[in-house]
Amino acid sequence: MFLAQEIIRKKRNGLALSTEEIQFFVKGITTNAVSEGQIAALGMAVYFNDMNMDERIALTTAMRDSGTVLNWQSLGLNGPVIDKHSTGGVGDVISLMLGPMAAACGGYVPMISGRGLGHTGGTLDKFDAIPGYQTEPSSELFRKVVKDVGVAIIGQTGDLVPADKRFYSIRDNTATVESISLITASILSKKLACSLDALAMDVKVGSGAFMPTYEASEELARSIAAVANGAGTKTTALLTDMNQVLASCAGNAVEVKEAIDFLTGAYRNPRLYAVTMGLCAEMLLLGGLATDEADARAKLNRVLDNGRAAEIFGKMVSGLGGPVDFVENYSKYLPQSQIIRPVFADTQGYAHSMDTRELGLAVVTLGGGRRKPGDALDYSVGLTQVCALGDKIDASTPIAVIHAQSEDAFAQAEEAVKKAIRIDEVAPEKTPEIYAYIRAADL
């Protein structure tokens, strides 16, 4: 028998907790046997004294097991269950293409995604822009779409990792969100509850990233790769660039449009293509669906070129309640803003740097993101045709096009966009889209 206060005292004094102590405490979070004050105290003790890798694995698996753990064996799937998770960014629409692409190559992708908060967009918010699409289907429908289509992208259900829900809300109110150990457990408990065979983790770096520095992003990526592999899920973490908007746009309906254009081949932003292919190829390799990276990329390009990935996206949308002709006629269904107008820079030169976080917040100000949980969104607003770093900018080249519902909202966003994108006489040095891969062998 353990006492919560003794577990807190032990971590406060900088000692390692046993697996049994961690399991006891996490069970108490779920059953309310542990008070809010005790959870806050342990969170702060971990924040200051950290956890070793064994503790992190124990915390992650205990939180994973605090609710329902999905089981795919009864469905008789004839391929690996694989997924991707991102720490979030601006214009990060990768999931919408990657899920169908991986499914078209023989994987099964039960992707449980989140909503946007702060400056980052949420995958679920993008799907909410599609009329009829159920982001919270019954577990039966979720399983059916995964089996029949190969991919389903939905929101977290109430019975998945309840311990994380309670722990996270308390961390949010007590300034312990930034702990690498606790971030690792929070992210991975949700993913591992999906009983994945393999996971590709996208950890963002730069001005639009969740972590403030490259070093912090790398530390988180290493922690996630080590804990996930330690918990039995083959995982690679990629460090990818978020020093500029990833797609050519940021918002909800506008990102859905870009995803469909990508899948159908109408337009593929080169940076978005590079990161999507890097993550998706890694999923195929980890899942045993490709022999090497060249084979994985060839398979992915094939399902893009022959239309199979776009077809699967359409089947997922209709399977979860959306229009059956959405891919072919998306412009008929996606909402559009009252005002769609370009923004021009005050000076000429090259797009030199971007405060990506501020561009994300400009979308929030337009009504496309949340200031607080529960805020209603306007799915039509956002930015399109956002310039890329290194683009030559003159008086006739817009740095972005703003989609707004009022002149006031447009003016506010215009000011923010001009401030966030710096124009210089000199072109910036080109940075890679993917900085590093952290695989099990690298740990």
Swiss-Prot record:
Homodimer. This is Thymidine phosphorylase. The keyword Protein transport does not apply. InterPro entries: Glycosyl_Trfase_fam3, Glycosyl_Trfase_fam3_N_dom, Glycosyl_Trfase_fam3_N_dom_sf, Nuc_phospho_transferase, PYNP-like_C_sf, PYNP_C, Pyrmidine_PPas_bac/euk, Pyrmidine_PPase_CS. Its EC number is 2.4.2.4. Pfam families: Glycos_trans_3N, Glycos_transf_3, PYNP_C. Belongs to the thymidine/pyrimidine-nucleoside phosphorylase family. The keyword Transcription regulation does not apply. Pathway: Pyrimidine metabolism; dTMP biosynthesis via salvage pathway; dTMP from thymine: step 1/2. Keywords: Glycosyltransferase, Transferase. HAMAP family: Thymid_phosp. The enzymes which catalyze the reversible phosphorolysis of pyrimidine nucleosides are involved in the degradation of these compounds and in their utilization as carbon and energy sources, or in the rescue of pyrimidine bases for nucleotide synthesis. GO terms for cellular component: cytosol. GO terms for molecular function: 1,4-alpha-oligoglucan phosphorylase activity; thymidine phosphorylase activity. SUPFAM superfamilies: Nucleoside phosphorylase/phosphoribosyltransferase catalytic domain, Nucleoside phosphorylase/phosphoribosyltransferase N-terminal domain, Pyrimidine nucleoside phosphorylase C-terminal domain. PANTHER family: THYMIDINE PHOSPHORYLASE (PTHR10515:SF0). It comes from Shewanella sp. (strain MR-7). It catalyses: thymidine + phosphate = 2-deoxy-alpha-D-ribose 1-phosphate + thymine. The lineage of its organism: Bacteria, Pseudomonadati, Pseudomonadota, Gammaproteobacteria, Alteromonadales.
